[in-house]
């Protein structure tokens, strides 16, 4: 992953006046992973999700970084998110697959789907993988970088609720 700006992450601290505290990315990752483990996520999965959140912040995608931690922790605590999903391939061909996320954390399902896609692309030349029954996906660029690290072109995308009108639109 990216080392960011000297491996440090600015973290907003909410007080009467907005301030920022800068911490080492490694410290932040360890803290986030600890919180996720405390909510029932297995250690290796907690480490991966924490790394994906901190990486988003290091890349400037703060909307999908550590800002997401309260939601992720709450959804684990309230059993909205499955902390130990049995992620699996539902159906597949030489260059495609459908993955069932079993209600697991989006970063875990996204990683699995991209790993399947990478393996198929290396074998078939290109591949498409879809996933269902997954929670919040996180930063899509994180998964595309997994493909880039293997000298592949990766695209990652997800569905979302409409949140703003298209240019010239009212709804």
Where are the regions a protein language model picked out?
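Glycine-rich anion/phosphate-binding loop at the beta-strand->alpha-helix junction
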Residues: 126-171
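Conserved catalytic cysteine-centered active-site region
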Residues: 116-129
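Active-site cofactor/substrate anionic-group-binding motifs, chiefly glycine-
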Residues: 65-118
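Helix N-cap / loop-to-helix initiation motif
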Residues: 41-46
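Generic N-terminal amphipathic, Lys/Arg-enriched alpha-helix
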Residues: 18-39
């Amino acid at each position: 992953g990216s080392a960011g700006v000297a491996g440090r992450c600015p973290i907003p601290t909410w007080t009467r006046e907005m301030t920022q505290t800068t911490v080492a990315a490694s410290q932040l990752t360890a803290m986030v992973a600890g919180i996720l483990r405390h909510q029932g996520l297995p250690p290796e999965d907690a480490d991966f999700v924490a790394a994906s959140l901190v990486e988003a912040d290091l890349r400037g995608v703060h909307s999908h970084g550590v800002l997401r931690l309260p939601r992720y922790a709450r959804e684990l605590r309230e059993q909205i998110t499955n902390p130990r999903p049995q992620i699996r391939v539902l159906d597949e061909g030489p260059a495609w697959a459908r993955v069932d996320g079993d209600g697991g954390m989006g970063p875990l399902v996204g990683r699995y789907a991209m790993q399947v896609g990478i393996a198929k692309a290396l074998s078939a030349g290109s591949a498409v993988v879809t996933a269902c029954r997954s929670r919040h996906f996180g930063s899509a660029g994180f998964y595309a970088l997994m493909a880039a690290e293997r000298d592949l072109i990766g695209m990652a995308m997800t569905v979302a609720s409409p949140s703003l009108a298209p240019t010239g639109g009212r709804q």
